[in-house]
Each structure stands twice: as C-alpha cells, then as structure tokens.
Swiss-Prot record:
Subunit-level organization: Interacts with the C-terminal extension of AtcJ. Also interacts with AtcB, but not with AtcA.
First and last residue of the signal peptide: none
Name this polypeptide is given: Adaptation to cold protein C
Activity regulation (UniProt): Interaction with AtcJ stabilizes AtcC.
Length: 298
C-alpha cells in the first residue's frame, strides 16, 4: 500500500493526518512504517475476505477500501482533530480501531439498503463502500459526505419505522416504497382525527361515510394541536427530530386534505361509483393531498 504524504486539503483524512504529522515532525519514520504495515495487513485481510488477494488490481482495491474506511472511523474517533487523530494512529491498535469504527458506521447506515438485497461486502452496501473507497493521493475525497447522506437517509427510515410502529396497524413496510416522512405522519394525524386516535388501517375511504366531520377540525390551530399530540406519543428526541423536519406548509396542506375528505364523503353518501371517486381523487391531484391514502378501493 502506498500512502502518499502531501498537503491535500480535500484528500482522504488518513493521508491528511499523516502528511501533517510528517510536516510538524510529530510522526517519525518508524511510526509511519508501523502504520503502513498495519494498513497493508488490514488490506490483505479485506482482500482475502471479499476479493482475490492474488490479483494485484483487487489487492489495490482493498487498499483503497481500507484507506477510506480508516479515514471515516478516524474522523469520528478524533472529532476531526488531526493532532488527536495522529495520537490514535500511533497506538498499537489505532489503525484497527479506526477501521472497525468506520466499518461499523457504514454497516449501520446500510441496513435499510440491504433489506431486499445482498452485498458483496456482507452488511455494508456495495455502492456506499465504493463512494468511501479512495486512493491515498486523491485530490478530493467525498467519502465522508457520502456517509453523511447515507446517515440522513438511515435516520429518515428510522423515523418512518417509529411512526409506523406507533400509529399504524401494519407496522412493517418496504424501504423501496420510498415513503415520505411528512406523508406518513400526515396520514396518521388525519386518520386519528377522523377515527378517535385509532391506528391507521387501509379503510379510511370506506369508513369516512359513517362518521360526522366536526366543524372544529377545520382550522390550522386544531390540526397543529393534533400533530403535537401525536408527536408527544413518540420518544422526545425522535419527536423533536421529526418536528424540525416538518415544513411550514404541513398544517395548511393537511387542512386542504381535510376539505377534500369532506367532498369525498359527500360523493360516497350520494352513492358515487368507484370510478367517479377515483376520477375525483386524480382531479384534485393525489400528490398534493398530504396525508390522503394512496391505496385503491376495489
């Protein structure tokens, strides 16, 4: 493995730390050799597990994977402080700890990506590892940004799962459905409003004809109150995260959907055909009806 030491502001964090250590005379030649030796050993182990270690280009790929994963773990363990990072690297198991941390980070954010598929790299998504992997002398390393994007998506999936578990009768879902966090919460708030805080089922379009819509529901204040009431049933940290993620148009959009629900109910009471109801939905624009269920009534 070649670890090129030069001043690269945007390169892999591992290379940046080693270059600074050399420049500041805080990293000796012997210490550098030990770090490189441990990184090479890590590359051989990775190649033996996932690649063909006897093919030079695959061994090189494993080395790039190690540099990226170690850089990621090193950033996390050192809080991106290069002096602290160097002190960690020169410890006996510093490189191993950084790799294990980086791999663990990638594994966590890969979970939802691997629900319906398998990865060459076990519990780490192949595409994500490819984004993190880097040669040591890369002018630009976007591995940390790729991880951050994956982390945001992972947290979004966790939030959706928590909403489903708390407010839906059917708690499992396929991440490939690309559910929208706002829509999942909005459907729960709407359903709870209509059916006395019941868990969401795929029966709103049939049941709505059997209830009376209260005048007090048709106000932004009431909808905001119902939204906060729902969020209060979630763990505080999660509720705060979801609340901050909601757009300013959440309550107005849900109020529009409630007015639509009133018109839909009137059509039901007038024995409108399923085809007419479906046309009415599409005329209003299903995408613009926040919280309105998308399933088809047969």
């Amino acid at each position: 493995m070649q670890l090129v030491l030069r001043d690269i502001d945007q390169g892999p964090f591992l290379s940046k730390v080693l270059a600074k250590g050399q420049a500041d005379d805080t990293l000796s030649g012997e210490q550098l050799a030990q770090i490189k030796s441990k990184a090479i050993l890590m590359s051989l182990k990775l190649a033996d597990k996932f690649y063909n270690k006897y093919k030079m280009h695959l061994l090189e790929q494993a080395a790039h994977d190690v540099i990226g994963v170690v850089s990621l773990g090193l950033m996390e363990l050192s809080n991106q402080d290069q002096q602290q990072a160097l002190r960690l690297l020169i410890t006996a198991d510093g490189v191993v700890k950084c790799f294990q941390k980086g791999w663990s980070m990638l594994s966590v954010v890969s979970k939802h990506k691997l629900v319906n598929s398998k990865s060459l790299y076990g519990d780490v998504d192949k595409f994500l590892l490819e984004q993190v992997s880097t040669p040591p002398d890369a002018d630009e390393w976007l591995g940390y940004e790729a991880y951050q994007d994956a982390l945001v998506e992972h947290q979004r999936q966790q939030s959706i799962a928590a909403l489903m578990a708390q407010f839906y009768a059917q708690t499992s879902y396929d991440p490939l459905d690309f559910l929208n966090l706002e829509s999942v919460l909005a459907e729960a708030v709407l359903y709870r409003m209509l059916f006395d805080n019941a868990k969401v089922r795929q029966d709103l379009k049939k049941r709505i004809a059997k209830i009376s819509l209260q005048d007090e529901w048709f106000s932004l204040e009431y909808i905001e109150q119902q939204t906060q009431q729902a969020l209060a049933e979630l763990p505080a940290e999660l509720a705060d995260t979801i609340g901050k993620d909601l757009g300013k148009n959440f309550a107005p959009a849900l109020l529009r959907t409630l007015h639509f629900a009133k018109s839909y109910r009137e059509l039901l009471l007038n024995d409108a055909s399923p085809e007419r109801l479906e046309r009415f939905e599409h005329k209003e624009g299903l995408v613009g009806l926040l919280g309105w269920p998308l399933y088809i009534v047969l």
